[in-house]
């Protein structure tokens, strides 16, 4: 089943909307953004989430000890590094936050530079300087995320064949196009912010529900297709 993160959560209301709709994770932006929250806000909002819903703090080039302190205070279950963080940064962060999930955002160009065109060749975990999952996002000179723009899915398709690590797709997703993104890329997870909002920082209940429904419909159809293929191979 596709992992779904609703990012840019700014209130208990929005957290409740995402949780009731079936999100697997909430994202809290701790860097300058229209969706930025304070550590106190993130902690308070996170208390409404049941244990099975992950709480991911999103950081951009934060000082290591500061990030670790915030993550502990907010009781995040994971952190998403959305800046220029290096492999050495990730390794050191793991010593400060042992056992915490680490996600690292990359653009399609950065992803292409990390592997041959023939397929995904990420070093498998548990190497300390490698994140647990890569988040493939669109970026502009003005914004590192939350652009509302998609990237070239066809170009990315060849890079996501048989990945050794999970890949999460973000960038311009909404209920209308997430099915096509899933069919093209078959990622481990999807991440959405602007595509389910009334305006930046305010989630639209209907848009959140429709997005998650679209993902689950794809999952159901994909599972049924796999089941039919399995039965056919047994004949």
Say what each PLM segment does.
Residues 7, 82, 169-173, 193-196:
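Glycine-rich beta-strand-to-loop/alpha-helix junction loops that act as flexible
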Residues 25-34, 40-41, 47-164, 168-169, ...:
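Conserved anion-binding
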Residues 1-4:
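Extreme N-terminal starter segment of soluble prokaryotic enzymes
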């Amino acid at each position: 089943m596709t992992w779904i993160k609703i990012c840019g959560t700014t209130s208990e209301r929005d957290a409740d909307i995402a949780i009731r709709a079936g999100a697997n994770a909430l994202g809290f932006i701790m860097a300058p953004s229209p969706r930025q929250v304070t550590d106190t806000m993130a902690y308070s909002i996170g208390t409404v989430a049941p244990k099975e819903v992950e709480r991911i703090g999103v950081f951009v080039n934060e000082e290591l000890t500061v990030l670790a302190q915030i993550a502990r205070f907010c009781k995040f279950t994971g952190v998403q590094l959305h800046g220029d963080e290096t492999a050495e940064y990730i390794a050191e962060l793991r010593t400060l936050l042992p056992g915490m999930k680490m996600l690292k955002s990359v653009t399609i160009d950065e992803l292409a530079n990390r592997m041959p065109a023939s397929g995904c060749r990420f070093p498998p975990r548990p190497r300390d300087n490698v994140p647990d999952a890569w988040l493939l996002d669109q970026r502009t000179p003005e914004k590192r995320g939350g652009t509302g723009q998609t990237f070239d899915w066809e170009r990315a398709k060849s890079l996501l064949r048989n990945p050794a690590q999970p890949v999460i797709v973000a960038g311009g997703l909404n209920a209308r196009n997430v099915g096509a993104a899933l069919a093209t890329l078959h990622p481990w997870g999807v991440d959405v912010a602007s595509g389910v909002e009334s305006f930046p920082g305010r989630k639209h209940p209907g848009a959140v529900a429709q997005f998650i429904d679209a993902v689950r419909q794809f999952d159901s159809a994909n599972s049924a297709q796999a089941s039919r293929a399995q039965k056919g191979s047994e004949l």
